[in-house]
Amino acid sequence: MMRILLFLATNMAVLVVFNIILSLTGIQAQDATGLLLMAALFGFSGSLISLFLSKTMALRAVGAEVIKQPRNDMERWLVNTVRSQAERANLPMPDVAIYHSEDVNAFATGPSKNNSLVAVSTGLLRAMTQDEAEAVLAHEVAHIKNGDMVTMTLLQGVLNTFVIFVSRMIAKVVSSNRDGESSTGIYFLVSMVLEILFGFLASMIAMWFSRYREFRADAGSAKLVGKHKMIAALQRLQRLHEPQELEGQLAAFAINGKRGGLAALFMSHPPLEKRIAALQQLDSFK
């Protein structure tokens, strides 16, 4: 996985544009209400754009092909399995796609429950048993059922708004002299530094929520197909070679996850052993 998530990169670009516009226009956003509205506008823009373009971006990022008409038994099984799970979850049928990769992975994306995508790699289909692959598909369907794509978009928008608003307010105080006049250069420098620092904190919050969301998707898979199948799928991932990582927002909705140490704070997924332990503690969904 790229260190900078694609989903967050779009928002970072919006922050840069926001700074450039304010600098060129000389707007200091002295009115806190005006600044808050401006921060919300720019804070949510990148997230919403990423959400609405998520399916197109995902298909292009991994070269996935949507199965419009199954051409073989594997494709028929994939489509029928996702259809069955979607019906049990009271969801409209998502698009189903396959992408060619040795990576053992799958992901879900899309702007809404009515316009979603489940994609799976050829590497996963070769490496996992049918029961294990079924559990992985159920995990992705659970992401859609839980509305995780929209929830992450809203959270990211709020975090972006916070980063812009607070950094600008602090920068104004720091750059103002005793006469109440602000130094544009100091204001711009301080606001940029603070946005970077607060941006890291915001990313930590977003990734914490992403990890929490993975536990919910695992439980959703257990509800659809039984927890023993989901546990088997996660155990399979443990036994396989460390998988290649997906780019950007795809990683946040994929099945696997890695990293340790300080980088664990920026992990989109909990460690596999913790996910397995959480499933084993479920009393239902045998």
UniProtKB/Swiss-Prot annotation:
GO CC, one annotated term: plasma membrane
Keyword set, alphabetical order: Cell inner membrane, Cell membrane, Hydrolase, Membrane, Metal-binding, Metalloprotease, Protease, Transmembrane, Transmembrane helix, Zinc
Cofactor(s) the protein requires to work: Zn(2+)
InterPro entries: HtpX_protease, Pept_M48_protease_HtpX, Peptidase_M48
Note describing how the cofactor binds: Binds 1 zinc ion per subunit.
Family statement: Belongs to the peptidase M48B family.
UniProt xrefs under CDD domains: M48B_HtpX_like
Membrane topology note: Multi-pass membrane protein
Keyword Transmembrane helix carried by entry: yes
EC number: 3.4.24.-
Xref: NCBIfam families: PRK05457.1
Record's keyword annotation contains Cell inner membrane: yes
GO molecular function, one term: metalloendopeptidase activity
GO biological process: proteolysis
Annotated compartments: Cell inner membrane
Transmembrane segments: 4-24, 33-53, 147-167, 186-206
Organism of derivation: Pasteurella multocida (strain Pm70)
Binding site for Zn(2+): H139, H143, E214
Residues of the active site: E140
Protein name: Protease HtpX
Principal place of residence: membrane
